[in-house]
């Protein structure tokens, strides 16, 4: 009989329907009050050929009845002992609990399996080393709101109040929305900010929205939490930073719905190159031209990529109204990509930008801009002359033309293209400092002297004449005669006076005749 009972209890097969109660009892397959019990498949039982239960459901029922024989049978069929204990706790069949107490190492393991709050608390009480704090933590973790409600007064006690923050964070981490709502309505949450940070990390918009309901409705209604407009905006701005950094457009819209500043959202989107967010907010909020330009300035400041700059420019049809402000940012932050984009769209701001660079920036940045946009030397020098940047002109010219003679030749050509006298004189002064700093070949000096005469550069010409007389003496006869002819033709009396003085020296030295002098003048000089 033992082997037959063992065979019937351990294997899966259908019992004959005509087995008597006595036979079933002998086989160990009779459940008092229910009838026959047999195993079907791997995880189910059939009771009285009619009711089908999972093995663990049957264990709960057997535990509730305190029927250890059936519990042992179901354990033989690979049931989970935890369910039997849960059933026994529910109906307080502690004799059955004691029977298996030694097999449970940690009573917390049973808690996720329990649906009934009272049974949940009874099970937790078996962990003798735990206290109310531990119970509340597990109640939050396994969504036992009724337990929190039961111990609300304890939570409001000053001794427990410090634990509210930890329970709140735990509820956020486990997405217990019902508990979070109750806590917001009933408990003084010290810092509600974790609900927002956790929602952003987990991309949980529902939790994020609940956070605002807790802060702006529940907690304010309790009189526990009141935000001034300034503090409210600081919080919303901080949230903008978090969600835009992760590109979470729905979260951005949620913040805007609760009073977030559109300009701040745009600023973060530009700074962090979140074009999808930028585009959506601009179009949804109908952002004005002036604001778009401010965002463009910010993009320039942050060296935004081409796509971001193009997007911003497209909103204003590539028409910049406040060019001055834009150029200030371009030069200040040495961010020239926007100028190139506008140039591609036939919006030429090169001259204006170069002027701003020459006026306000350093030699290195000016040189970089000239090279990047292939600016002609003549264009740069004319702008630099207008801004009176002599040191900058000399430095850039040294980069462009290493040979001093070549430098002077090119600068002389540019002088001839400058239409205003003060500009010509300014550049001639620079040419003269180059002459003074280097040793030029005689023929270059002679050409420079003629150039000075043509432009009535009296002081520089006088300086050059001294050099020529001291170093070449009578060999300069032809030059002086040529200069005299030019000065006479252009009616430059000061130049004529200087030349006449040196011609007099030549005449005294016998290096020049009266006839040669008279050929130059259109009238007769009595002094000769």
From Swiss-Prot:
What induces the gene encoding this protein?
Expressed in the early phase of the viral replicative cycle.
Give compartment(s). Answer: Host cytoplasm
The biological processes this protein is annotated with in GO are:
symbiont-mediated suppression of host innate immune response; symbiont-mediated suppression of host JAK-STAT cascade via inhibition of JAK1 activity; symbiont-mediated suppression of host type I interferon-mediated signaling pathway
InterPro entries in alphabetical order: MGF_505
- Which ranges does the UniProt record give for the ANK repeats? 129-158, 261-290, 292-321, 322-352
Cite a GO CC annotation.
host cell cytoplasm
Q: Which Pfam families does this one have?
A: DUF249
Main localization category: host cell
Task: Give the record's keywords alphabetically.
Answer: ANK repeat, Early protein, Host cytoplasm, Host-virus interaction, Inhibition of host innate immune response by virus, Inhibition of host interferon signaling pathway by virus, Inhibition of host JAK1 by virus, Interferon antiviral system evasion, Repeat, Viral immunoevasion
Provide the family line.
Belongs to the asfivirus MGF 505 family.
Record's function text: Plays a role in virus cell tropism, and may be required for efficient virus replication in macrophages. Interferes with host NF-kappa-B promoter activity mediated by TLR8. Mechanistically, inhibits the phosphorylation and subsequent nuclear translocation of host NF-kappa-B RELA subunit downstream of TLR8. Promotes the expression of the autophagy-related protein host ULK1 to degrade host STING and inhibit the interferon response. Also inhibits JAK1- and JAK2-mediated signaling and thus negatively regulates the IFN-gamma signaling.
User: Quaternary structure per UniProt?
Assistant: Interacts with host STING1. Interacts with host JAK1; this interaction leads to JAK1 degradation. Interacts with host JAK2; this interaction leads to JAK2 degradation. Interacts with host RELA; this interaction inhibits NF-kappa-B promoter activity.
Tell me what this protein is called.
Answer: Protein MGF 505-7R
**Protein's organism:** African swine fever virus (isolate Tick/South Africa/Pretoriuskop Pr4/1996) (ASFV)
